Design a protein with these regions (language model features):
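Regulatory modules associated with amino-acid/nitrogen control
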Residues: 1-94
């Protein structure tokens, strides 16, 4: 059972390639995450959602809008944009 948000960033070396967000709620976060990433020039190239442990797990594969790698400062900015969205679910439900 998912009792608190779980966020797992997938990297290939220094490059951020995907994020997986698990939450208690069954309300998808893709809309909020997409808006935050779009502001950074990032897109979601693939999305999967599955029910798990009474909640929802979303897997998002990321890419730069103009091509190239998501690494360094851009990787840190993407993570910083995603984490508050995932953690906000816990605050509003808790």
């Amino acid at each position: 059972m998912i009792t608190h948000p779980q966020v797992r960033f997938e990297q290939r070396g220094p490059e951020l390639v995907a994020v997986e967000i698990g939450q208690r709620s069954c309300s998808p976060l893709i809309g909020s995450v997409h808006r935050a990433l779009f502001a950074l020039g990032l897109d979601i190239s693939s999305y999967r959602a599955r029910p798990e442990g009474g909640g929802l797990v979303e897997h998002l594969v990321l890419e730069r809008s103009g091509g190239g790698r998501i690494e360094g400062a851009l990787s840190a900015e993407a993570k910083a944009a995603i984490l508050p969205i995932a953690l906000q679910v816990c605050v509003t439900e808790g």
